[in-house]
Amino acid sequence: DFDGGGSASASAFYADNDRIQCWDPWVMQSSDRTAYDYPETHNRVMKIMQFALQRAKEQNAHDHEGPRLWGVLVTGVDLWDSVCVNNMRIVDLNLAKDGIDSADWNVKVGHQWDWAIRKTRFHQLTAVCKGLVKQGVRIFWETHLRLTNYSFGKNEEAAKWRPDWEKASNNFVFQIITMNREDTYDDETGKLLKSEYTATFDKCKTNAQLQGQKRTVLVTEVGKPAVFLGLPELYDGSL
């Protein structure tokens, strides 16, 4: 739960469900000028995911009894990407002593920011997630978006809202669902009347019928109770 969204949702909507466990991946510094210990945060993420993978393997044994691991949601995958970038600077290339230290420019140019290292770190999480999928566990990644065409400042024409890390994901992600909010305003007063939250299947390798389809998941209107419709495809097997 990198961005805290998982624990917030669990607290707000599933307070009585003790089967939803939220894990904070961040490791704080005990006495330093930076808040986070990036190397130990990377290690903690790996320990959490490897624990989940071990549980998934154990529950597939014929004599297993008790609760089963249904799925794993990783919130703020873009923040995991930032952990990998900082570790590339601090640990792998020794360009900075912590997450806020400026790198020596000559050294940085010499190494050209070795993005292959960052990519390798990032895909440690990907590898464990793929292992969980093979064990029958559902994996969901939630991420913030950036307006980009992956030229990284060279030419941002025709930019779209995309995950920063998607270009380096090697097509490991089979489905991409983009969430949007569409607002309706009063023509005379300009006040907000209604908000419609939608989910668009921008990518769906496992079900061609869903490709490009859009669903309304939540509707809020001023003075009326919110109407939650959800996204049935997430749990009915059609993905």
Regions found by a protein language model. Name each.
Residues N17-Q21, V91-N94, L218-G223:
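Short, low-complexity, polar/charged sequence segments that are solvent-exposed and flexible
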Residues L229-L239:
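Glycine- and charge-rich intrinsically disordered segments
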Residues H62-A168:
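P-loop NTPase motor core
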Residues D3-A8, V27-Q29, V77-W80, L145-N149, ...:
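Conserved nucleotide-binding/hydrolysis micro-motifs of P-loop NTPases
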Residues D1-A61, E65-L73, L79-S82:
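Conserved P-loop
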Residues H123, C129-G223:
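Phosphate-binding/switch region of NTP-binding enzymes
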